[in-house]
Amino acid sequence: MSEQETRGANEAIDFNDELRNRREKLAALRQQGVAFPNDFRRDHTSDQLHEEFDAKDNQELESLNIEVSVAGRMMTRRIMGKASFVTLQDVGGRIQLYVARDSLPEGVYNDQFKKWDLGDIIGARGTLFKTQTGELSIHCTELRLLTKALRPLPDKFHGLQDQEVRYRQRYLDLIANDKSRQTFVVRSKILAAIRQFMVARGFMEVETPMMQVIPGGASARPFITHHNALDLDMYLRIAPELYLKRLVVGGFERVFEINRNFRNEGISVRHNPEFTMMELYMAYADYHDLIELTESLFRTLAQEVLGTTKVTYGEHVFDFGKPFEKLTMREAIKKYRPETDMADLDNFDAAKALAESIGITVEKSWGLGRIVTEIFDEVAEAHLIQPTFITEYPAEVSPLARRNDVNPEITDRFEFFIGGREIGNGFSELNDAEDQAERFQEQVNAKAAGDDEAMFYDEDYVTALEYGLPPTAGLGIGIDRMIMLFTNSHTIRDVILFPAMRPQK
């Protein structure tokens, strides 16, 4: 057996011994009838204590004689004979406990406290003071074991480093890694700030079906499920768009939804099959209004959540306080591939040849508009680092967007890019029922030709349009990618609490 194998075997034995030891301690607690008490109440969290009392010196704290109670997980413990220091971690952060034998009821220190393990959840009551190094601490007069941890924590010095374990056992990641906890705190704050931003502008939050008979609103491969009672195949939604626009037809002129979408596609650092989107629809507006709203939203979120309009992502700094760049799709192609003959983008055969020359495999079902879009994706998208709006998307790849009045081959649509990736997609909505019916039929034809991401024909949505959809603009923003930017996270798995993972064998 190699040295590495021997070390691994010894670690497994040590781990099993620790599990056995902890279970024996729990068994003893059960016999005493105090295994999982539920009568301890705290009056402060660690962050509340630091915020209120960090500025006070020890003399002032002693004169105030402030008694507090806290509860949380024991992360570290230094036993020094008759006294110990404990690091307690709770939802707000960490606070130090000073545990002295003579300050506790008889027997608690030696017979109970010293037998507890790291990871145990405890309650503590005592008075505030500061150590000689100036650290705010609690001099404990009462200690309670609230939950016995049967498994040891990850490496207490280096945190949890194994990426697979971090994602599969997110609870361990949250215990061990401050950055992970902060990422999801920021996520929650951003979602709350988005809702506040939208409601302040007269939008109503709504909920639309997650299971749909006809999946629509995006070009993507759906998940299929079966409704037993109805004996009906249904689809997990790929987007809420068509239902939200039905609500605008019904008279709700400003609506938004923050919820999950599901797409049966690949997994990557940018893609998870289950992801969060915000979609909004605003009557009597066009895509220019949404460009202004998007800029304002990102500026507001940065200021309110991070306290600055400058956001650092990797080696880049984005200043949301400045106007965002705006380019048409063709301008972006020319900017990032200057040798492009723009006339080639007006001819199918020339565009096809150009696409193939830069490594794009052109599918039989693609028209000129799809080819031009793929060329843009290949030559320009990765260069769109600073906040940029790309406009004038071809009608072929925009089956729900309003055609441009001057050039009907393009639409009044934009996509919003930051850090070389798409963050949002918005457009003036197509509200011509006959045009929509024709485009749905084109999608049906594309699906028949082999495009499994083409849309289904939604007859009821066409019927809704026949009752009249007012001039409307719609916007979708990928919340997960937004959170990646605001938390400087470089894989989508870092911002989704429980990302999709292949089952362990």
UniProtKB/Swiss-Prot annotation:
Q: What is this protein called?
A: Lysine--tRNA ligase, heat inducible
Q: Which GO terms describe its molecular function?
A: ATP binding; ligase activity; lysine-tRNA ligase activity; magnesium ion binding; protein homodimerization activity; tRNA binding
Q: Which species is listed as the source? A: Escherichia coli (strain K12)
In its keyword annotation, does this UniProt entry include Protein transport? no
Which reactions appear under catalytic activity for this entry? tRNA(Lys) + L-lysine + ATP = L-lysyl-tRNA(Lys) + AMP + diphosphate
* InterPro entries hit by this protein: Aa-tRNA-synt_II (IPR004364), aa-tRNA-synth_II (IPR006195), aa-tRNA-synth_II/BPL/LPL (IPR045864), Lys-tRNA-ligase_II (IPR002313), Lys-tRNA-ligase_II_bac/euk (IPR034762), Lys-tRNA-ligase_II_N (IPR044136), Lys-tRNA-synth_II_C (IPR018149), NA-bd_OB-fold (IPR012340)
Highest taxon of the lineage: Bacteria
List the EC numbers from the record.
6.1.1.6
Q: Any idea which residues bear N6-acetyllysine here?
A: K114, K156
Read off the NCBIfam families from this record: lysS_bact, PRK00484.1, PRK12445.1
Keyword Cell division present in the record's keywords: the answer is: no
Q: What Gene3D superfamilies does the database record attribute to this sequence?
A: Bira Bifunctional Protein, Domain 2 (3.30.930.10), Nucleic acid-binding proteins (2.40.50.140)
Could you read off the lineage of the organism from its UniProt record?
Answer: Bacteria, Pseudomonadati, Pseudomonadota, Gammaproteobacteria, Enterobacterales
Q: Where does Mg(2+) 2 bind?
A: E422
The UniProt entry's GO biological process terms, in alphabetical order, are: cellular response to heat; lysyl-tRNA aminoacylation; RNA capping; tRNA aminoacylation for protein translation
UniProt-annotated binding residues for Mg(2+) 1: E415, E422
Q: State whether it acts alone or in a complex, and with which partners, per the record.
A: Homodimer.
Q: Which gene encodes it?
A: lysU
Q: Required cofactors, per record?
A: Mg(2+)
What keywords were assigned to this record?
Acetylation, Aminoacyl-tRNA synthetase, ATP-binding, Cytoplasm, Ligase, Magnesium, Metal-binding, Nucleotide-binding, Protein biosynthesis
Note how many cofactor molecules are bound and how: Binds 3 Mg(2+) ions per subunit. The third one is coordinated by ATP.
Q: Which SUPFAM superfamilies match?
A: Class II aaRS and biotin synthetases, Nucleic acid-binding proteins
Instruction: Report the GO terms under cellular component.
Output: cytoplasm; cytosol; membrane
Q: What class of enzyme is it?
A: ligase
* Family the entry assigns: Belongs to the class-II aminoacyl-tRNA synthetase family.
| Record's miscellaneous remark | There are two lysyl-tRNA ligases in E.coli: lysS is expressed constitutively, while lysU is heat inducible.
